[in-house]
A protein has these predicted regions:
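Conserved signature/switch motifs of ABC ATPase nucleotide-binding domains
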Residues: 122-125, 143
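The feature captures the beta-strand-to-loop junction immediately N-terminal to the Walker
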Residues: 40-42
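Conserved ABC ATPase "signature" region
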Residues: 101-119, 171
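Helix-to-loop junction immediately C-terminal to a conserved catalytic motif
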Residues: 55
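Short coil-to-helix segment of the ABC ATPase nucleotide-binding domain corresponding to the Q-loop/switch region
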Residues: 84-91
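Catalytic Walker B motif of ABC-type/P-loop ATPase nucleotide-binding domains
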Residues: 148-151
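ABC ATPase nucleotide-binding domain "signature" region
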Residues: 38, 135-140, 144
Length: 241
């Protein structure tokens, strides 16, 4: 058993149903502080339900969810306010700081972190998809957040932009470490980002394989660790012999 002081999130024998539909079955897991845990599995297996349970948006039908730290969620489609500028959207995540000079300093630091200097007064519709997701990420990092729950945050972007966003996320985490639970259908993304991958079964979801990716980030997509992780995920999902 891991030291409880090092665990940010955990499920203890969690099951969840929507009416007669059993989505999760007796699921137990732990997320370590500072870890990037990636969830992959068949469509509709309950990955987003797991994030909603971890965030506290829903309560489990059975079992216990434990949380230590402040949680922010990043979704597939950014939740930026279209009537606010980049700077104003980021400032919305800083309200907990209270002190205006401190907020201004933190906002400036975050804009520099996501490499959007000069775009502070632009509105979301004036930005590319990748730029909007960077603003969304900055807002999630703002304030006192310790944990990021990321629900397919790059899936709506084109392939080249997804690759760039993965590298951006790795760079940002080196400067601002966070605990991350990341849901994706993209096995390449999972192998490139994860410290640990949980491969989930079809509904009701159980953990059918746990994979540790013991290679520093950023990772070469043609490197042995990434290729072997991708191959194992494909086999577990029944997509490769």
């Amino acid at each position: 058993m891991n030291d409880k002081q090092s665990v940010s999130l955990s499920f203890d024998n969690v099951s969840h149903s929507y009416g007669a539909v059993n989505v999760l079955q007796s699921l137990s897991l732990e997320v370590q502080n500072g870890e990037v845990l990636v969830l992959v599995g068949p469509s509709g297996c309950g990955k987003t339900t797991i994030l909603n349970l971890l965030s506290g948006h829903i309560r489990p039908t059975q079992g216990r969810v434990n949380r230590t730290g402040n949680i922010r969620t990043v979704y597939q489609h950014d939740g930026l306010f279209p009537w606010l500028t980049v700077g104003e959207n980021i400032d919305m995540g800083l309200r907990s700081l209270g002190n205006q000079p401190q907020r201004e300093t933190e906002k400036k630091d975050l804009i520099e972190l996501i490499h959007l200097q000069g775009f502070e007064n632009h509105y979301p519709h004036q930005l590319s998809g990748g730029m909007r997701q960077r603003v969304e990420l900055a807002r999630a990092l703002a304030g006192q957040s310790d944990i990021l729950l990321m629900d397919e945050p790059f899936s709506a972007l084109d392939y080249q932009t997804r690759l760039r966003m993965r590298l951006e996320l790795v760079r940002i985490l080196k400067q601002r470490p966070r605990t991350i639970v990341f849901v994706t259908h993209d096995i390449e993304e999972a192998a490139q980002l994860a410290d640990r991958v949980l491969v989930l079964s079809s509904r009701p979801a159980t953990i059918c394989r746990e994979l540790h990716v013991n290679e520093q980030r950023p990772r070469d997509l043609t490197g042995a660790a990434v290729i072997e992780t991708m191959k194992t995920i494909l086999i577990e999902l029944g997509l490769q012999q």
